[in-house]
């Protein structure tokens, strides 16, 4: 018994991610710390003019417990550090050809041997990187030579230009398309506490 006509389809997608990063660390007298970093990322899936984006960041810390004026100020205090940071990160969570109008093939419902080509997505060359800005301020502390230690962190992050699917009017002939349309903000406080109840030394 014959199997009928056999059709073969192939799909090929190609894209490229490239990233460059540089970082500089500075430490003075084990008291003052400064770190600066810079990242440049590229994604071939974006249109010309939007393929590359820059994401800098900076952080600083101050070990207060190393300062003379902090000695014997707080009973039992063995370590105290203030720190802060601010930086940008990027996200390119789209498919390889999301900025282009793409086509697909199909068969007519009345004649399976008739092949036709149709446009199945809209172009949006304005798509660009989603960017998250994050700031953090923290305090690390230790008491009794580290038998009690912990940290307090206050953070806030905001993501702009999130890459989301947005519904389109029926008259366009498409149900949805990708846009830089989302925004989300996170903020909070994190606490941690560690204790050494039994020291075997």
What does each model-identified segment do?
Residues 1, 5-201:
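Extracellular/periplasmic, surface-exposed regions of secreted and cell-surface proteins
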